[in-house]
Amino acid sequence: MFVKVRVPATSANLGPGFDVAGLAVTLYNTFTFELLDEGLEILGCPEQFANKDNLTYRAFEEGARYVGLDYKGLRITNEGDVPYTRGLGSSSTCIVAGIVGAFAFKNRYEERQNILELATKIEGHPDNVAPAIFGGLTVSVMEEHKVTTLSIPVKQEYRYVALIPPFTLSTEKARSVLPQTLERADAIKNVSHLALMVASLINGYDEGLKLGFKDRFHQPYRGHLINNFFPIMETLEKDERVLGAYLSGAGPTIMALIR
């Protein structure tokens, strides 16, 4: 018996929406889960991750405990195109797939809110896992242990171009450079930019996107970890074809929005 789960890559933060906003994109990882008589087999990933510390396996275990799935052995096969540690939600694909896989064996794969709660518990924040589960553009709020997510339809004529560099940047390192506090003026700017960005995506208001994607919380700091980040952003800012650009997730991928 097997279950196959396809999960989209996600682009989180979208400039000012740090740990809040995320977007599902048309790049996918596919995971196959097969129940075995014994043992654990993990295929399609680097050998150092093919063990019980594997993120997909840990997520499957969480999901199995939640739904009461009793199994003796498991084979996980990973196939896909989402690059690792590039700011496109590769870890979220693993987490969401593992939980959904376990839920599916109990025919409970449509319990999206429960899947979201478990995925956020593992990931620590909902900005990547929410769009991977609900699709489209999502905004999420965490209050204690409860996650509230809204999936928002955006104009389909927008296209997202990912500038993926040939190097990685871990989320841990990217978070380590963030400030502990934010000046009031910067906080107000980010809130206003987030509101403008979301409204512009919903209504197809091109003129609001370049300003709406601007950020004062994480990009000014993370940009120093990425070769040529600021010159690239300046070039995209001047390009009339580009409606807006931002650092995808923790980086180093830069996402540009065009029609």
How should each PLM-predicted stretch be described?
Residues 110-158, 245, 251, 255:
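Alpha/beta catalytic cores of group-transfer enzymes, especially the acyltransferase/condensing modules
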